[in-house]
Regions:
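Conserved catalytic core of the tyrosine transesterase superfamily
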Residues: 1-295
């Protein structure tokens, strides 16, 4: 397999992303988007005109791209033209599409339990990894990048190093989860990475963890259309249903904006069920009125 040639322009884009502390996943997404634009143009992307951008956006729309994918590419091109090319004015010719607001899928507590118990073996590796995803609300990449030293059993905390947005944070470590992690450590004696891959100098990959989740979900007989990230959604929703302050959940999830966390208020069905409708107060007044009329 021949290595892909890195042009001076691509190298500059990569350097600009590194300077701004962009994560590896975001870097790859930006490069893919810029490559797609270059393929559409048939020439170097830095030579594009406003008309080229208009034609590309029409092409993406006609190709049936989802608003989410469309916007991901626009974000990448805005970065490319403003930061790498120094052509800030080009941002005026790129429009975001409105994304339909979909409520996240959420598991019941029983479904989470069934999935974790069905995690593939041998051993406790994937059960422990998936349990952290739910028990601490971590993203797949955050679970994979955990080190043994990130588990603080004295203060019952997990240190999440450079999560999304390149920010560190602390999350809770429950006694039950600590017990499972200790059982995993006694079984495998991992060094360095909490969940080593092959070779052991590398951690397991998000793709491996996602495959383990899919297998566990299938074995547990859970039919909901869900991904590994659904465990994180469920963590947040179950906390909210237990009356945890939404601002605390925001910190635990590592959300920069409270509005991002607030969407879980729309799926906290237990909270909805337990909330008394003002109609109940009206009904009581009506009952009292009826009783007085009968006296």
């Amino acid at each position: 397999m021949t290595e892909e040639i890195v042009t001076p322009l691509r190298q500059r884009v990569i350097e600009d992303m590194r300077i701004r502390g962009m994560g590896e996943k975001a870097q790859k997404s930006h490069i893919r988007a810029i490559k797609d634009f270059a393929a559409f143009l048939g020439r170097p992307p830095d030579t594009a005109t406003p008309e080229d951008l208009r034609a590309y956006q029409l092409h993406m729309t006609d190709s049936g791209l989802t608003p989410s994918t469309f916007n991901v590419r626009i974000v990448a091109l805005r970065f490319f033209f403003s930061m790498t090319c120094g052509r800030e004015e080009m941002k005026r010719y790129m429009q975001f599409r409105t994304e339909p607001r979909k409520l996240p899928v959420v598991f019941s507590v029983e479904e989470v339990s069934d999935i974790l118990m069905a995690a593939p073996g041998p051993g406790l590796k994937y059960r422990a990894a998936l349990s952290i995803s739910y028990g601490a609300g971590l993203r797949a990449s955050e679970v994979c990048n955990l080190k043994i030293s990130d588990i603080d059993s004295d203060r019952m905390l997990i240190h999440v190093e450079l999560g999304k947005g390149q920010k560190d944070r602390k999350v809770m470590l429950s006694p039950g989860l600590l017990e499972l992690l200790r059982a995993w450590w006694r079984e495998a004696r991992p060094e360095g990475w909490l969940f080593p891959g092959k070779p052991k100098i590398n951690p397991i990959s998000p793709r491996q963890l996602s495959r383990a989740f899919t297998s566990a979900k299938h074995m547990a007989g859970v039919k909901k259309p869900a991904t590994l990230h659904t465990l994180r959604h469920s963590f947040a929703t179950h906390l909210l249903e237990a009356n945890t302050d939404v601002r605390v959940i925001q910190v635990l999830l590592g959300h920069a904006k409270l509005t991002t966390t607030a969407r879980y208020t729309h799926v906290a069905t237990k909270t909805i069920r337990d909330t008394v409708s003002p109609y109940e107060m009206l009904a009581k007044l009506q009952d009292q009125t009826v009783k007085r009329s009968l006296e």
